């Protein structure tokens, strides 16, 4: 099992350059860890668009990802990959350390995003339109990471993350309505 204690360790193992010590966007198409289980010591948000053999494991059950699915992990949680020990073929991993939230509005609101405590069987399934919106949020975060770090970086990054999480709240509510 891989145990990523820092965003830097995660980037190094997954072959990504660290642009900010507390937050990273990792394109899963370019990442191939050698272990099938990863423990994240920071927040992790996975957008899974394509998995080997159309399945991926969250917890102990496998799920069909016909369009896209999101999984949310709090610091200390474990993600179990597919039975082939690979990350999804297409998607993104947003990694952000709790220290990023210090002195930002997200620090006070992170507890309101209750889906971080959902069982992995309650992953968020997205429509094509929703996937496009979430991908845009990831791209905005990635674009901000390309700027040199300054006194505004943490605030801007945390606001982009908060916007992403607000969209996820909306989509979860839609999912609950349509599943009834």
Regions found by a protein language model. Name each.
Residues 125, 148-156, 169-180:
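Short, Lys/Arg-enriched, Trp-marked, Pro/Gly-tolerant hinge/linker segments that flank
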Residues 7-13, 17, 82-146, 166, ...:
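A hydrophobic/aromatic-rich effector-binding and dimerization subdomain
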Residues 1-64:
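Generic protein-terminus/edge-of-domain signal
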Residues 53, 71, 75-81, 101-102:
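Histidine-centered metal-chelating micro-motifs
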Residues 68:
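Short hydrophobic/aromatic patches on the structural cores and recognition surfaces of FHA
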Residues 161, 165-169:
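Short, amphipathic alpha-helical segments that act as regulatory/interfacial helices
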């Amino acid at each position: 099992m891989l145990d990523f204690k820092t965003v830097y360790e995660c980037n190094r193992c997954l072959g990504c350059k660290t642009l900010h010590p507390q937050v990273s966007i990792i394109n899963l198409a370019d990442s191939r860890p050698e272990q099938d289980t990863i423990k994240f010591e920071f927040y992790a948000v996975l957008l899974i668009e394509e998995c080997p053999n159309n399945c991926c494991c969250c917890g102990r059950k496998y799920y069909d990802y016909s369009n896209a699915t999101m999984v949310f992990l709090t610091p200390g949680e474990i993600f179990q990959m597919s039975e082939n020990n690979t990350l999804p073929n297409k998607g993104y991993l947003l990694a952000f350390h709790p220290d990023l939230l210090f002195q930002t509005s997200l620090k006070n609101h992170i507890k309101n995003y209750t889906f971080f405590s959902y069982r992995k069987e309650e992953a968020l399934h997205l429509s094509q339109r929703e996937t496009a919106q979430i991908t845009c949020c990831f791209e905005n975060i990635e674009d901000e990471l390309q700027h040199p770090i300054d006194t505004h970086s943490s605030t801007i990054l945390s606001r982009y993350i908060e916007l992403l999480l607000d969209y996820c709240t909306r989509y979860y509510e839609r999912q609950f309505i349509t599943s009834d």
